[in-house]
Amino acid sequence: MLKFLSTKCKQFNSLNHIIKHKIYFPSKSNKSYFSSSVKDVEKKNKEPIIQLTNDAINKMKEINLKYKNSKALKVCVEAGGCSGFQYSFSLIDKNKIKDKEQIVYDKDCIVVIDKQVIDILKNSKIHYINNLISKKFTIENIQNISSKCSCGNSFDIDFV
């Protein structure tokens, strides 16, 4: 859920308005879409909402090897950061995915996103950076960005 920041009240309310009217709900016939079966997810989601680079896929394979193929990558977007909004990543159990979350299957990993932020993250790309400075997942090509912070995790959105 997006957190309220008083300094970004207008943008936050606009984002909620956009999210409220463009939210994606899978049909009731897609009950298996939220099951813990990776094969069901693969069949239901042929067009991924988010792309993953090979580095990101390989990192998730490495993580799932360690955790016996039980983890999914959760992407969150919330109000905050230097530029207005920020994204973060966490690992969640595949069998604890909630109905308010959307599953995106891409090759050998599962990415989970709150349904509220699908339009913000649609057509973006998750990458994994592994260098001397940091080891982390990042998101590239987020649509409608008006500005970005040098930290790479914070951005502002143009509300159309």
Swiss-Prot record:
Question: Where is the protein found, in the record's own terms?
Answer: Mitochondrion
Q: Which UniProt keywords apply?
A: 4Fe-4S, Iron, Iron-sulfur, Metal-binding, Mitochondrion
Example GO CC term: the record gives: mitochondrion
**Biological process, per Gene Ontology:** iron-sulfur cluster assembly
> Chief subcellular site?
mitochondrion
Task: Please give the Gene3D superfamilies that the UniProt record associates with this protein.
Answer: HesB-like domain
Pathway, per UniProt? Cofactor biosynthesis; iron-sulfur cluster biosynthesis
Claim: Transmembrane helix is one of the keywords in the record: no
Pfam families in the record: Fe-S_biosyn
Which InterPro entries does the record match to this protein? Answer: FeS_biogenesis (IPR000361), FeS_cluster_insertion (IPR016092), HesB-like_dom_sf (IPR035903)
Molecular function terms, GO-annotated: 2 iron, 2 sulfur cluster binding; 4 iron, 4 sulfur cluster binding; iron ion binding
Tell whether Cytoplasm is among the UniProt keywords: no
**Record's function text:** Participates in iron-sulfur cluster formation (ISC) pathway for iron-sulfur (Fe-S) cluster biogenesis. Can bind iron and [4Fe-4S] clusters. May function as an iron chaperone.
Q: Give the matching PANTHER family.
A: IRON-SULFUR CLUSTER ASSEMBLY 2 HOMOLOG, MITOCHONDRIAL (PTHR43011:SF1)
Listed NCBIfam families: iron-sulfur cluster assembly accessory protein
Q: How does it assemble?
A: Tetramer.
Report the family membership.
Belongs to the HesB/IscA family.
**What name does this protein carry?**
Iron-sulfur assembly protein IscA1
To which species is this protein native?
Plasmodium falciparum (isolate 3D7)
**What is the gene called?**
IscA1
